[in-house]
């Protein structure tokens, strides 16, 4: 049965009416004054993550209408279809099974009766590959002659492992340094190579097809540098994370780890693409990372919608985007190790849900993915928080805080936590008794995600939470969250422009591109 498009459901009309009568004038300060139990009602526990949703512009009635919208658009059926291995990526005719990468060999409770029988063989392949990858990771960790690991990839082959290695810095094996090269801009690779010695470096080439232009350009340059510096054993100092084993072998690489076409790039950190993380934190740590994500999978798959954290977050995103008209969300992790977390979420959400047509290719009359942006706190307070507090646009903020520090420097962590609590409070309560430039309107919404500690398990759960939250909003909007056709046109045109930069031929180009090309060649 084809789900009903969200704007054609009774729940959508009810939500429009609710926004006009209550939502647009909703006052957080008044809501707390009238309801002593608001914090408890709008707080939600989930594996490794506690969420305070109480500072959002929503009441119980509106949330019930949002839950009804989810039901009327077939969210539960769509979720179950994903976990059943159905080809819900309809434009590419692929299943969406990144969750299988973190499913234990025997888990009889994954959703409607676990891993379906037809996926048992695939799950076995997943764990065979995982064991081989972790064995390699442990060998690299034990090899004291390898001090530098360079991951060459782009998009999901870069952002995921880079974000995770940085986030789990407290767990990284001493004596190993990790570098990530993604940009085709040679300055990035050159800056890394200047710090390396070929005999102590391992290069990981991460490309599913082993044809990605940026990645292979960097890989060839890294290989040329290695050989020019006297390196001779390509097979020992290069490994490939790819499905194109033949191309890797032709490159001179004999050690390869593959994955499957149902693993999208932005969901690939759980696969062989996570090898840098496995080397950094070890096999035990990587298994904990997978286990944390799997715990969130179970939560999403089995907990009723009203107590399901990814569902509540995803529906809140729909409420803000389509009824309040908010076009962006600020991500503010109050932990310096999460410095690449906002960038990771940018790709996850904006590449997944930044679509203008539905899953059937029909143009949509309503907004989809918001713009995500942010920086770690407290740095962001001295950059863009001015606009969050006193700007003309309301931007929902999503804070992430960690209860326990991974250092023993006295006073620092308490001050950090005081700041994140104060910012969330200030956004809500404002300062009405001051005039003019010192007036803070308040009533600015925020969500607060709290981890007990930043560990492999809690990071895995946090990432999986965000994956499923994006699934929820994309499902309600009726879009395919698992393709990314929007990245293709620029790549095609870049090949043509590269030839023109060499030849100078501007025939058929628009005036602006022709003028810029001529100036670059002058």
Swiss-Prot record:
Pathway: Carbohydrate biosynthesis; gluconeogenesis; Carbohydrate degradation; glycolysis; D-glyceraldehyde 3-phosphate and glycerone phosphate from D-glucose: step 2/4. Its main location: cytoplasm. Pfam families: PGI. GO terms for cellular component: cytosol. It is found in: Cytoplasm. One of its GO terms (biological process) is glycolytic process. Keywords: Cytoplasm, Gluconeogenesis, Glycolysis, Isomerase. Its EC number is 5.3.1.9. The keyword Nucleotidyltransferase does not apply. The active site is at 351 (proton donor), 382, 491. Coiled coil: none annotated. It comes from the Bacteria. PROSITE patterns: P_GLUCOSE_ISOMERASE_1, P_GLUCOSE_ISOMERASE_2, P_GLUCOSE_ISOMERASE_3. Gene3D superfamilies: 1.10.1390.10, Glucose-6-phosphate isomerase like protein, domain 1. It catalyses: alpha-D-glucose 6-phosphate = beta-D-fructose 6-phosphate. InterPro entries: G6P_Isomerase, G6P_Isomerase_C, Phosphoglucose_isomerase_CS, SIS_dom_sf, SIS_PGI_1, SIS_PGI_2. GO terms for molecular function: carbohydrate derivative binding; glucose-6-phosphate isomerase activity; monosaccharide binding. PANTHER family: GLUCOSE-6-PHOSPHATE ISOMERASE. Catalyzes the reversible isomerization of glucose-6-phosphate to fructose-6-phosphate. Belongs to the GPI family. This is Glucose-6-phosphate isomerase.
């Amino acid at each position: 049965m084809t789900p009903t498009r969200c704007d054609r459901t009774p729940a959508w009309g009810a939500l429009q009416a609710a926004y006009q009568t209550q939502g647009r004038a909703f006052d957080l300060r008044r809501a707390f004054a009238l309801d002593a139990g608001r914090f408890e009602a709008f707080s939600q526990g989930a594996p490794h993550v506690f969420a305070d949703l109480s500072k959002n512009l929503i009441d119980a009635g509106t949330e019930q209408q949002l839950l009804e919208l989810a039901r009327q658009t077939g969210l539960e059926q769509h979720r179950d279809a994903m976990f059943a291995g159905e080809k819900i990526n309809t434009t590419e005719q692929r299943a969406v099974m990144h969750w299988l990468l973190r499913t234990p060999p025997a888990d009889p409770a994954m959703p409607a009766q676990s891993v379906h029988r037809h996926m048992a063989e695939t799950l076995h392949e997943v764990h065979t590959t995982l064991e081989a990858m972790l064995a390699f990771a442990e060998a690299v960790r034990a090899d004291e002659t390898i001090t530098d690991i360079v991951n060459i990839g782009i998009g999901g082959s870069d952002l995921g492992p880079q974000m995770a290695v940085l986030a789990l810095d407290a767990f990284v094996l001493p004596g190993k340094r990790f570098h990530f090269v993604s940009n085709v801009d040679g300055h990035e690779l050159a800056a890394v190579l200047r710090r390396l010695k070929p005999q102590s470096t391992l290069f990981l080439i991460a490309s599913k097809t082993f044809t990605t232009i940026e990645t292979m350009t960097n890989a060839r340059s890294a290989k040329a540098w290695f050989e020019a510096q006297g390196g001779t054993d390509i097979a020992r100092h290069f490994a490939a994370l790819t499905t194109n084993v033949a191309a890797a072998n032709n490159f001179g690489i004999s050690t390869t780890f593959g994955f499957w076409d149902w693993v999208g790039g932005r969901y690939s950190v759980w696969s062989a693409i996570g090898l840098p993380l496995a080397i950094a934190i070890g096999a035990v740590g990587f298994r904990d990372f997978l286990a944390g994500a799997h715990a969130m999978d179970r939560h999403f798959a089995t907990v009723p919608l009203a107590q399901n954290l990814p569902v509540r977050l995803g529906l809140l995103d729909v409420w803000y985007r389509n009824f309040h008209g908010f076009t962006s969300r600020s991500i503010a992790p109050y932990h310096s190790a999460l410095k690449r977390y906002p960038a990771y979420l940018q790709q996850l959400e904006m590449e997944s849900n930044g679509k203008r047509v539905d899953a059937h290719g029909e143009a949509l009359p309503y907004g989809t993915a918001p713009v995500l942006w942010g920086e770690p706190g407290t740095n962001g307070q001295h950059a863009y928080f001015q606009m969050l507090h006193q700007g003309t646009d309301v931007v929902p903020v999503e804070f992430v805080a960690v209860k326990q520090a991974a250092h023993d420097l006295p006073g620092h962590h308490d001050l950090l936590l005081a700041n994140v609590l104060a910012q969330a409070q200030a956004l809500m309560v404002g300062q009405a008794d001051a005039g003019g430039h010192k007036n803070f309107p308040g009533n600015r919404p925020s969500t607060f995600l709290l981890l007990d500690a930043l560990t492999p398990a809690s990071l895995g759960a946090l990432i999986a939470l965000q994956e499923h939250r994006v699934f929820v909003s994309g499902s309600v909007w009726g879009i395919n969250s698992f393709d990314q056709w929007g990245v293709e046109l620029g790549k095609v045109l870049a090949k043509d422009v590269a030839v023109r930069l060499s030849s100078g031929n501007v025939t058929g180009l628009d005036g602006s591109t022709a003028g810029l090309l001529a100036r670059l060649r002058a």
